[in-house]
Amino acid sequence: CSFLFCIPLAFYYQFANGYLTQVGLKNATGWMSLGQFSEIFFMLALPFFLRRYGIKKVLLLGLVTAAVRYGFFMVGGTENMLMVTLLFVGILLHGASYDFYFITASIYTDEKSPSHMRTSAQGLITLITMGLGALVGNQLGGATLEHYTLTVAQGNETFNWFGVWGFGASIIVFVTILFVFFFKENEEYSKNAGVNVFH
């Protein structure tokens, strides 16, 4: 699931800045830094979520927030305050999505791996996700953007962003369904694992 999740996740890193600029958000690069600040907040909140909900539900929350973010980007814009708010909430959800999924997945990998193999396990996961997953995501992202290129520009927009983000969101929904059905973990262990890491 982590490999598959990294494929649509690459869309955010590839397209978010250009998308925000085209829909009329000034200083898009600066505003996107809010996503990094939100990572700090959600990192601090992660122990609470792990203790209360357990690893599986927190991982699921990371997937769901990623899909919601793309959903907000599908309908966001600068035409009115509501649409602008959706853009900013979408940016802020980057921290929730990244921390709740990838940091929690790292914790889970650490808990499940024998002590002498933890470093190797983390390296393998990083290679599969940020290496292969990101590579496939970048390739698919390029093809997606080409597919959704407008033949006639609509104002400043040269791409059908609704389609781009909708496609990304649909992949995340598919990954989420796979995760729900195939990720099996004892609920008691799931909660205790999170507690053990932060003690």
Where are these regions (language model features)?
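Helix-to-loop junctions at the C-terminal end of transmembrane segments
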Residues: 42-55, 145
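Loop-to-transmembrane helix entry/capping segments in MFS-fold secondary transporters
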Residues: 26, 113-126
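Loop-to-transmembrane helix entry
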Residues: 21-40, 85-86, 162
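Helix-loop boundary and gating motifs at the non-cytosolic
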Residues: 1, 5-33, 102-103, 138
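C-terminal ends and interior cores of transmembrane alpha-helices
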Residues: 65-80
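A membrane-interface helix-boundary motif in multi-pass transporters
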Residues: 142-172
